[in-house]
Design a protein with these regions (language model features):
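Active-site environment of divalent metal-dependent phosphoester hydrolases
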Residues: 9-12, 41-45, 72-75, 99, ...
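Mid-to-C-terminal alpha-helical segments outside catalytic/metal-binding sites
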Residues: 2-4, 8, 12, 16-33, ...
Length: 245
């Protein structure tokens, strides 16, 4: 099992989330790998957080480093993506939900174009209606863009965007309505869905249970919980069947 959405670090409001808590959750719930990013990138400074995240992941190889990018303070997209890819980050993340900024900007599109060249996957929260607006002006892309924190109320925008763009993937954490996972699988294929918990800010188990207690075929569950992420972030084959099959 691979968790594509974990965090650590301090917030300005007094919370302190430890990467040790992520590791403990991985041991408890049999998670093989977890993508992890630093809240310092969201609240303080992305570049300053990069060395810290890489150091944590070197010490704990089952943690895979995700860089945080702040669209308010990033004016060299090509240099940024090249630096992150060269340093060993497996993906880059936009903290749009914390920074209260829109993806519908020329700078995001420039960063996505640079990520396309180097095939650096991108993760981003996108409020309802923003996904299509942000991506519409762009040409065809193949670099994986993973939409975080979506829910059933966003389906009208997200599913439309995913039909148009085969490089879009969806974290399933917010899809806890009855039969919603079966609905998503029917419309996108299980190869476009990924397990992410947002631990330790949120609990890991409820998100895993969304998959485990669904009526999906076992092979679909394995794709969502493990195989899709392995193909995207570890370059392992066996997931990402993009058609609704």
């Amino acid at each position: 099992m691979i968790d594509i959405h974990t965090l650590y670090g301090k917030t300005p409001y007094g919370q302190n989330y430890l990467f040790e808590s992520v590791l403990q959750g991985m041991e408890r719930f049999d998670v093989d790998y977890a993508l992890i990013s630093s809240l310092k990138a969201a609240y303080y400074s992305g570049p300053e957080s990069e060395a810290e995240v890489l150091a944590v992941c070197r010490k704990h190889p089952r943690l895979l480093p995700v860089a945080g990018i702040d669209l308010r303070n990033n004016f060299s997209p090509e240099e940024t993506v090249f630096r992150l890819k060269s340093a060993g980050f497996v993906a880059a993340r936009f903290f749009t939900e914390i920074n209260h900024i829109s993806l519908d900007t020329p700078l995001f599109r420039e960063l996505a174009a640079a990520a396309e060249v180097l095939q650096l996957p991108l993760l981003a929260d996108a409020p309802a209606g923003m996904v299509s607006a942000a991506l519409r002006p762009m040409g065809p892309l193949t670099v994986p863009i993973i939409l975080l924190s979506q829910n059933a109320y966003d389906n009208y925008d997200v599913l439309g965007a995913m039909r148009e763009r085969k490089n879009l993937y969806l974290e399933i954490r917010g899809f806890n309505s009855p039969d919603i996972l079966e609905y998503l699988t029917a419309h996108t294929g299980s190869g476009r869905l990924l397990f992410g918990s947002r631990a330790p800010m949120d609990y890991l188990l409820p998100t895993r249970n969304i998959v485990e207690y669904s009526h999906l075929l076992q092979e679909d569950k394995e794709r969502i919980l493990d195989k899709n992420a392995r193909q995207i972030f570890l370059n392992e084959k066996g997931g990402c069947t993009n058609a609704a099959d």
